[in-house]
Design a protein with these regions (language model features):
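Bacterial N-terminal signal peptides
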Residues: 7-16
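HIT superfamily nucleotide-processing domains
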Residues: 18-183
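Bacterial N-terminal signal peptides that target proteins for export
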Residues: 1-7
């Protein structure tokens, strides 16, 4: 029983380390010494790529997500990077590129998601692209005509988007929208 008790204490002590939360991100491309942190790896990846196109696509390196792509903007804002730091034309181009990649890979079964800051493991803004899981739809969404109409998430919030006929359903206030996508 004593060993079990110590294991429980250790697990509780380590629990905060298992949380994904980039609200205190320090990644700054102008200060190379800040870029060594694990949560800065997508920033480093983007900096190592050609300046064009403005959105680049990489496979998710998490071995538990073999079916996922990530859309990375060339944009570097303040840390942690959020969509609200981008201009409306930058956001529209970014959403459009992610949706196009989703359609290319998954046809009409695509879904895209951006996790909230408390659930993100990377400081660099990124959109998860995957196949929408069956049964994911819920009643908490807004209908928009296209990428230009996708609302900007409130500070730190996440969202997920999928096709609905010739419109899009945007599910807001979703901390971990990527869970609606095939891993």
């Amino acid at each position: 029983v004593s060993t079990l008790r110590w294991f429980a204490i250790l697990a509780l002590w380590l629990l905060p380390l298992s949380r994904a939360d980039v609200r205190a991100c320090l990644c700054d491309v102008a200060r190379p010494e800040t870029m060594a942190a694990r949560e800065c790896s997508l920033c480093r990846d983007v900096e190592a790529m050609p300046a064009e196109p403005q959105t680049v696509f990489v496979r998710d390196t998490n071995p538990n997500k073999p079916n996922r792509w990530l859309a990375l903007p060339r944009f570097h804002g303040k840390s942690p990077q959020q969509l609200l730091d981008m201009t409306a034309p930058e956001r529209t181009a970014y959403w459009s590129a992610a949706i196009a990649k989703g359609r290319e890979v998954w046809g009409d079964e695509w879904g895209i998601a951006m996790n909230g800051l408390e659930k993100r493991t990377q400081c660099h803004a990124h959109i998860h692209i995957g196949k929408l899981l069956e049964g994911s739809e819920n009643d908490h969404f807004v209908v928009v005509d296209g990428p230009a109409d996708i609302p900007v998430p409130r500070d730190g919030d996440g969202l997920w988007v999928h096709p609905a006929g010739d419109k899009l359903h945007v599910h807001t206030d979703e901390p971990a929208g990527e869970l609606k996508l095939l891993r």
